Amino acid sequence: MAETESRKQQMNTDELRQQYEDGLVSIITPAYNAAAYIAETIESVFAQTYTNWEMLIVNDCSKDNTAEIVQSYAAKDKRIKLINLEENSGAAAARNTAIQNAKGMYIAFLDSDDIWKKEKLQKQLNFMQQNGYAFTFTGYEHFKETKENIQNQVQIPKSLNYKQALKGNQIGCLTVMLDRRQIRNINFTTQKQEDYILWLNVLKQGITAYGIQESLALYRTGNSKSISGNKLQSALWTWKVYRESQNISVVKSMYYMWFYVMNGLKKHR
């Protein structure tokens, strides 16, 4: 019985290797009216010490010249791939479209205004391959306008299982890398906090996420809304994640919300 199961697993692995390219990292980037920053984002990918990647940029019906900027890069380097959506669909749908077209065994996420440090892919891929991890993330920093204007560094745990992750989203989307051999259903919901929901759904399968204790990415902060307003809205969305997405009882949701608030207070140094 054990031998039969082992053969099935080997067959599944072989099928995945035929379907996806081993060692290739597919970078998923949704873009909407991103003309002001997307060149800097793409340049940070070009600067990576690990070069076996493809970057799938999904233009979500931008009204500026985002598509033209991306196309100018794609014309020079075939690793850049532009996908134009016919109608504005939101970041979750754009990411799903990119994932469906991705050829890599590894999936990484980078939004159109964020930046990676040059050793991000190399260090993270080594970390995953040496340990056999399916789900990893890294530390990152907030910056405003220019990458020299660092505001704070986000502290992350060394590892997270499902129950620990319910105490608050401590994983930055721009730092995540997933191994498709071990995680089959990588799909974003259209519900708010879609990245958090995906992490929870993956961890719910019994997978543990492991964090690299080093800042390898830069998250661009905006100032279109007040900080207090963002925090309140985020808390309301998190409550809906517990109740609607994860089907957690009111009492347990209140328990996890307490940790969510506490983690929010100590998240930044």
Regions found by a protein language model. Give the residues of each.
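Short loop->beta transition adjacent to catalytic acidic/histidine clusters or analogous donor-positioning motifs
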Residues: 22-25, 46-57, 65, 77-81
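Acidic helix N-cap motif at the loop->helix transition within catalytic regions
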Residues: 36-39, 64-72, 115, 119
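Short aromatic/hydrophobic "clamp" motif used to bind/position activated sugar donors
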Residues: 107
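Conserved donor NDP-sugar-binding/catalytic core segment of glycosyltransferases
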Residues: 119-150
